[in-house]
Amino acid sequence: MPNIKSQIKRVKTNEKSRQRNKAVKSALRTYVRNFRRAAEAGDVEAATKAARVANRQLDKAASKGVIHKNQAANRKSAISKKLNSLAA
């Protein structure tokens, strides 16, 4: 446990950030999973809606610094690729 006042606060804020980031990442996995399920079922309309939600959440997470912007871009690209192959 740190002795310096600023470091004590840092430990608290880091823990808050960790919990928040963990929740956001968990939600991201859920949104992507929902898209994959819709895509595997062959439901183009549901997959399109799920892809829109997943892409929006990925962008939000990247802008907040939870995930790197390139990781968000790669995931969005994979979602788009799968959606396009489904529609074709």
From Swiss-Prot:
Gene symbol of the encoding locus? rpsT
Family membership, please give it. Belongs to the bacterial ribosomal protein bS20 family.
**GO BP: any one term:** translation
Task: Supply the alphabetized keyword list.
Answer: Ribonucleoprotein, Ribosomal protein, RNA-binding, rRNA-binding
Q: Which HAMAP family match?
A: Ribosomal_bS20
Q: List the disulfide bonds.
A: none
From the Swiss-Prot or TrEMBL record, give the protein name. Small ribosomal subunit protein bS20
User: Pfam family of this protein, just one?
Assistant: Ribosomal_S20p
A GO MF term: small ribosomal subunit rRNA binding
Calcium listed as a keyword: no
State the organism named in the record. Cutibacterium acnes (strain DSM 16379 / KPA171202) (Propionibacterium acnes)
Concerning NCBIfam families, the annotation shows:
S20 (TIGR00029)
What residue spans carry the region label Disordered?
1-25, 68-88
